[in-house]
Amino acid sequence: MKLKYIAAFAFAVALASCDILDKEPSDSWDSGSAIQTVDDLKYAVNGVYETQTGNVSQFGNYTGDFGLFADMKGSDYKCVGNNNQATEISKYMATATGNLPEAIYYLFYKSIARANKVMEQTKAAGLTGDEVNAYMGELYALRALFHFDLARVYAQLPTVAKSMDDMGIVLATKTLDYTFVPERASLKDTYETILADLDKAIDLMEPIASTHDKNSTTGHMNYWAALALRARVNLYLDDVNVNGTTEHNKLALADAKKIIEEGPYSLYKYADYTSVWAKEFTEESIFEFQTTSQYNPQRNSLGYYTDPTGYAEAAMSDSFVDDFVKNPDYAKDIRVSTGMIKEESDGTKNKAFYTQKYPGRDGQIYVNNAKVFRLSEMYLIAAEAAWKTNDKTAAAKYIDDLRKERIADYVAGSTVSVTIDDILTERRLELNGEGHMAWDMWRNGKSINNPVAKEVKPGAYNAVFPIPRANINTSHGALKQNPGF
């Protein structure tokens, strides 16, 4: 894995106008006046998504190693293969000169830079109307998503940081040139900027019917996806004082509840659960980064990491197998059945239990969409947020509704009370392999027990990645490193 990196925040460069859904790559958008029509805007927006499909870089994106980041750092996954592609994550081997800390940093700021450039060119062109507002809302939501995930990787989580004045990330809310000297904003400013972008995205998209339509917005951040992200962000903030409030759980619950009650999505049925993972844009899917046979991260894809014939660097941990897969108490739970977690090997190599969430499409193991937001997560957000706002009855009902579609012969109403540990266990069962585990535990003040690093407490120095040294050097020390690196 050898990448050539330029200084972060100097990414306001040629902007690809590739429509990842149905067009071949065309000329770069390298002019300040390149976007002149709504069609130009459409293809430029698709160019932002393109950065996360493996076409710009095979490393560090949602459809590859970043999509498994919190799983590999957590308790429930282990590295079996010996290719050492993602051991900076799974074995806590990250350094300031390492490949993945640089790859994720580079790629996410490149994604933000593309979004910024498209927004600025659209405003400069004077484009207006509902279609333009829908695309602009999409861009604000994407920028919020990229900033949020950079904050999760490179800064401590708000609920475990010593203070919201602690270091957040560099915020890129406009196109920046090579003279820009990056400095890290506070955690407070970081999360307020993320929420401001989401509020703007939702305000722009809410009046526009097309942004509420599931079928016409597949592979794009629509109105519901922006709500889903805002719910997730507020859940991470818990009772931290941001935007003048500490009642973020109430806000998270309101957004999740709106999606559950009014959105065009429905929970996977028990009978369908094992078959949905080979499909795109299914009934639960709120937002996916799309891959195709042409646009995917190849051997650094979700499918290749989670297969014994691939890198086999994301198998189920022994503790997960013992706690759930082999535990008779979970024998009727479809999520840990042989249809979802299977013992496999590559001949005599890489024998372990593997998730079946990334089987590939059309016979290609590389081709798996990253399911960034699903309706199941909204039920789990609602349950956790309700529990934390003392509505324990509602919390139990959300878990009960989910279990009804996941456990054979389940009697509706069986779950009458839950603890926070019950909710976190439900998240481990439902969302494993989708990039949540370690962050879920840490933000709730709980340690993880990684198969290699063993106990990693919330707020530990190695819970985050180091800032790439090349970027610190370029800033002449203005960009500060995370402690411990």
Name each model-derived stretch:
Residues 258-394, 445-485:
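Elongated scaffold/linker segments in the mid-to-C-terminal portions of large proteins
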Residues 1-18:
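Sec-dependent bacterial lipoprotein signal peptides
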Residues 3, 18-68, 256, 310-311, ...:
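Membrane-proximal, proline-rich intrinsically disordered regions
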Residues 18, 224, 229-266, 484:
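Aromatic-residue-lined binding/catalytic grooves and analogous aromatic/hydrophobic interfacial grooves
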Residues 136, 143, 150, 230-232, ...:
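Structural register within alpha-helical repeat arrays
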Residues 84-154, 185, 200-207, 250, ...:
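Conserved, well-structured interaction surfaces
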Residues 151-158, 209, 236-245, 390:
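Short coil/turn linking the two alpha-helices of tandem helical-hairpin repeats
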